[in-house]
């Protein structure tokens, strides 16, 4: 159906443990599943196939084509270390709770997992709260808006996801 390295456009319809969006593609009598890192329900995304198996594929997010209806606009700039920054905290909580409960139910075989669940423990503040921050300096700046790389620049910020040499400059709050 697909091959490794192919770029596809899919609509994410559910969420899996570990921050992966799930897209289902009709394949005869069954469905072919595509797991897309850092995508969530309601988004239409462009993704590159990394791993191809018989019943499923794993893909890396390239671009969000259509945002989900629940996404909100914030004053914060996008950074690769916070892919769910634009998802309201109550939606994040719901996704994480259902993912956790379904994982424990599937592994344990116990179907009434909700009766054992005490609840979601929230962070003191949804924003401006981090357990740890690690900033990097680099002479290679990744420009977030255009996707370009600027060599010979001075950049202070977060490392671009999947790289150790590129930094996304922090120029907004």
Language model features: what each stretch is:
Residues 1-173:
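Accessory RNA-recognition modules of RNA-modification enzymes
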